[in-house]
């Protein structure tokens, strides 16, 4: 199978090359995004692999089909950039079913810690041999109240991480999960606290 890989980033190649080693899959990497102006690059390929900023609208779908492409593989969970109705009966569309909810929740906590402890500023200062603490002190998260809006997989994992920091967790969801062991409140109350 020959695959045209669009919107390629430097971090894409090593992982994909390793994954296809020993298979009959051949990838040609393009840094350009797939769209109406670049669809001809897919000529001679069985499939295209696209990312969030590629455009797979009806015109692109029809041209891909005319070029002999039969597969659109997305490197993301979202598929709002793909006209799935236009693909029906022509192209098979595959996407990432979900991201790791742990990775997303942990990243959210990393951002919270960065904002609170100013680690981004501290990094820049120490790199420049400035070890002043002025403007870098944050506050203890322990004992603070955090509000979690949305208690799906990611929200529940984030709440668990916050509890591990000793934080009080309030939650809001249109459809509260009774098994989550979270303290649900209405959104205005969550925002107030």
Question: Predicted regions span which residues?
Answer:
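N-terminal glycine-/charge-rich "phosphate-binding" loop or analogous flexible N-terminal tail
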Residues: 1-45
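Short beta->alpha connector loops
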Residues: 8-11, 31-35, 52-56, 75-79, ...
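Rossmann-fold NAD(P)-dependent oxidoreductase module
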Residues: 19, 107, 111, 157, ...
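Short gly/ser/thr-rich secondary-structure transition/capping motifs
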Residues: 28-33, 52, 125-134, 178-184
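Short amphipathic alpha-helix with an adjacent loop that forms part of the alpha/beta core around
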Residues: 36-44, 62, 186-192
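Phosphate/diphosphate ligand-binding glycine-rich loop within oxidoreductases
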Residues: 45-123
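Rossmann-like dinucleotide/phosphate-binding beta-alpha-beta segment
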Residues: 134-193
């Amino acid at each position: 199978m020959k695959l045209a890989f669009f919107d390629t980033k430097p971090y894409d190649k090593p992982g994909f090359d390793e994954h296809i080693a020993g298979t009959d899959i051949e990838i040609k990497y393009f840094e350009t995004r797939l769209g109406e102006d670049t669809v001809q690059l897919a000529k001679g390929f069985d499939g295209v692999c696209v990312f969030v900023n590629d455009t797979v609208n009806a015109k692109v779908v029809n041209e891909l089909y005319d070029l002999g492409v039969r597969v659109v593989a997305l490197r993301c969970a979202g598929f709002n950039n793909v006209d799935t109705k236009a693909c029906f009966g022509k192209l098979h569309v595959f996407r990432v079913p979900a991201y790791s909810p742990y990775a997303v929740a942990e990243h959210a906590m990393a951002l919270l810690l960065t904002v609170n402890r100013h680690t981004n500023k501290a990094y820049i200062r120490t790199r420049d041999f400035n070890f002043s603490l002025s403007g870098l002190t944050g506050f203890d998260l322990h004992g603070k109240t955090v509000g979690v809006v949305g208690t799906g997989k990611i929200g529940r994992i984030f709440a668990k991480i916050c509890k591990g920091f000793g934080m009080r967790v309030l939650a809001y969801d249109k459809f509260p999960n009774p098994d989550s062991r979270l303290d649900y409140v209405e959104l205005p109350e969550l925002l107030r606290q």
